[in-house]
């Protein structure tokens, strides 16, 4: 056995490195026991140690065992995300896209509609007296939704008659769908409970259809409804001087819808017959389809008519 000098069993390479035989290697371990124990201990640690654990992550990859806390947090977040219904970007944008209207007139609160706001007779009279007739007509358009005999019997001065919902599209829009009237509409009927709100809703439905590509924007965004209708307006003017009344009502008179003198006229209006032929009932919202056909054939559109809640006895 040899330690420093190679024996006959050892192999010496050309570069001078000696490869010890088994006897020389055993003798070397006896001479340097501590060094060999450290070496063997290191080898034992390496051979016995297991590779780092890897866990399957929720998104298909792997994470090391040292990141178990972070992995748990990620898994929880992922599960919460997956538990919620996914929605497209267009749906989210549509939900957030509400029409914002800056109503410059004093309105009645709380609001009862997303289409229009109500104003009182006092507010309307104040505007009519503050502005000249030309100034008022340049900014506003009064729409009387009562039947022609009611309108002719007495209406708000400067108001235009429009009682047929099927003509709303042609009244407010040109044949090419562009805006026809550059004024703010104010609707009313006898009580402003049925015909006035219906006409305002029809205007918004047609507006939405023609401007669907720029939703939620509309051509007629600011819309008003006269609270209490012509009945309340006429009653309010009774407290004014005669000179003031004639500037507000034209003629200074009031004809109710069920006036016995106009029974034959009332029967001519198919719109009213369709609504009073069936028992009236309360509802929060209803939809009926009205087809608007123009004789020129340039526009054929279908709108959904949405009515406000009404009373069982009301057909106005």
Swiss-Prot record:
EC identifiers of the protein: 3.1.3.48
Record has Hydrolase as a keyword: yes
Keywords: Cell cycle, Cell division, Hydrolase, Mitosis, Protein phosphatase
Start-end of Low complexity biased regions: 39-50
Annotated CDD domains: Cdc25
Domain annotation Rhodanese: ranges: 136-242
Segments of this protein annotated with the region Disordered: 35-65
Gene Ontology molecular function: phosphoprotein phosphatase activity; protein tyrosine phosphatase activity
Name of the protein described by the UniProt record: M-phase inducer phosphatase cdc-25.3
Record lineage: Eukaryota, Metazoa, Ecdysozoa, Nematoda, Chromadorea
